[in-house]
């Protein structure tokens, strides 16, 4: 990976293409957005693979993140809550959803990199196509 710093932004020259990074969200992705995106990219892909191995066919997974940051400590992230909403024709029991969430936490390299410094929760909720989220 190669990064070039110019003016108010950094441009990463990565395998997929260039990635503009800046604290100014009109000229690049904010570092916070990229940090959270890396966690979602890793955990979301892993969740999809786990569901496939468990033969839980799903139409879509939506992931919502909320965070708590500490302005007194360089605005660091102190807490992240990730909720994955799985849309499927079949529902998961609460026990299976908890087991799957635990597998994601234990096997996601990005989550494991920060789990000791950030209070992180990961929830899996399912909804069948004709029902509400469970």
Segments and roles (model prediction):
Residues 45:
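Short glycine/serine/threonine-rich phosphate/pyrophosphate-binding segments
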Residues 42:
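Alpha-helical metal-binding/catalytic segments enriched in His/Glu/Asp
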Residues 1-38, 48-134:
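Extended beta-strand/beta-hairpin segments
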């Amino acid at each position: 990976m190669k990064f070039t710093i110019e003016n108010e932004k950094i441009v990463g020259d990565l395998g997929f293409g260039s990635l503009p990074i800046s604290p100014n969200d009109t000229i690049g992705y904010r570092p916070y957005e990229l940090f959270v995106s890396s966690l979602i990219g890793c955990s979301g892909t892993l969740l999809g693979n786990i569901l496939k191995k468990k033969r839980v066919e799903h139409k879509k997974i939506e992931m919502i993140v909320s965070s708590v940051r500490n302005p007194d400590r360089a605005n660091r992230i102190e807490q992240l809550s990730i909720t994955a909403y799985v849309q499927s024709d079949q529902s998961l029991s609460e026990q299976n959803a908890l087991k799957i969430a635990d597998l994601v936490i234990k096997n996601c390299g990005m989550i494991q990199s920060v789990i000791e410094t950030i209070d992180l929760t990961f929830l899996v909720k399912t909804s069948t196509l004709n029902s509400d989220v469970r």
